[in-house]
């Protein structure tokens, strides 16, 4: 029941900032506060290409010994973390209600290659228990990327993926990113259920990752209650993105974008 309520019920901190305010949960409030989400018309992503983990230099013993100690106590850090998590969850839920589960509408066409920005270097264990790193293992050819942190967001991503049947040559990759260690380990425990939900041929394309960030505004994933999808080019730049459940117009724009991106890459 909670799932159905959430589905019928998002503001992109990506484009518009608003003052946080708790809202009434009445039906009247829902109808009165519905707004049309903006379109993602400018490139999103990181300005600098991430360094692959194998190239990151580990700190030396001297650097570890001379690193300044934290001035806050473990209890204080824990309290700050819990407060941040609480604010993030409440704000995310209010955003889902405000825009009916849609952070933004997809761009009508691909972002130009020269202005496109970089995707995060997500990494984790695949369903085949193999370690995967986005830039190390998936760079080199275009792919469709689904990003989510819960079943609701994953189902939204699947609503996009079901329209990709004519493009079976385009790899589909999944990242289930958790910012909570308990949820991360629960995902690992119930991994069998996840395996049953996707074809076996995709098991090595699905990773479960841990990252303690509560949002990724640089790539337009400001609300982890919903799922985001991306078209990633051969250099791991974000050329197109979507969120929530797709509209018919967005699906047609996605199909056109895939044809253009793949044909250019082949050519």
UniProtKB/Swiss-Prot annotation:
Main location: mitochondrion
A GO MF label: unfolded protein binding
Pfam families for the chain: ATP-synt_10
Superkingdom to which the source organism belongs: Eukaryota
Compartment(s) where it occurs, according to its Swiss-Prot or TrEMBL record: Mitochondrion inner membrane
Keywords attached to this entry: Membrane, Mitochondrion, Mitochondrion inner membrane
GO biological process, one term: mitochondrial proton-transporting ATP synthase complex assembly
Keyword Acyltransferase: no
GO-annotated cellular components: mitochondrial inner membrane; mitochondrion
Family: Belongs to the ATP10 family.
PANTHER family: MITOCHONDRIAL ATPASE COMPLEX SUBUNIT ATP10
Protein name as annotated: Probable mitochondrial ATPase complex subunit atp10
Record lineage: Eukaryota, Fungi, Dikarya, Ascomycota, Taphrinomycotina
Gene that encodes it: atp10
């Amino acid at each position: 029941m909670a799932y159905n309520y959430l589905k019928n019920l998002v503001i992109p901190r990506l484009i518009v900032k608003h003052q946080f305010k708790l809202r009434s949960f009445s039906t009247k409030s829902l109808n009165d506060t519905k707004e049309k989400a903006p379109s993602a018309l400018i490139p999103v992503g990181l300005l600098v290409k991430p360094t692959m983990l194998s190239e990151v230099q580990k700190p030396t013993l001297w650097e570890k010994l001379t690193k300044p100690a934290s001035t806050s106590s473990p209890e204080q850090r824990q309290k700050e973390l819990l407060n941040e998590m609480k604010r993030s969850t409440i704000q995310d839920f209010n955003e889902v209600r405000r825009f009916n589960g849609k952070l933004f509408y997809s761009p009508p066409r691909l972002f130009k290659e020269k202005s496109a920005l970089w995707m995060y270097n997500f990494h984790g264990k695949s369903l085949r228990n193999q370690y995967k790193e986005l830039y190390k293992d998936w760079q080199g050819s275009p792919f469709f990327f689904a990003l989510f942190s819960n079943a609701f967001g994953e189902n939204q991503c699947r609503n996009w993926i079901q329209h990709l049947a004519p493009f079976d040559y385009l790899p589909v990759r999944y990242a289930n990113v958790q910012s909570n260690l308990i949820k991360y380990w629960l995902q690992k425990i119930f991994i069998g259920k996840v395996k049953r939900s996707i074809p076996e041929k995709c098991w090595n394309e699905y990773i479960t990752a841990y990252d303690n960030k509560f949002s990724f505004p640089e790539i337009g994933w400001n609300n982890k209650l919903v799922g985001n999808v991306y078209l990633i080019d051969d250099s791991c730049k974000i050329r197109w993105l979507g969120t929530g459940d797709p509209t018919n117009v967005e699906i047609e724009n996605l199909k056109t974008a895939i044809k253009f991106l793949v044909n250019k890459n082949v050519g």
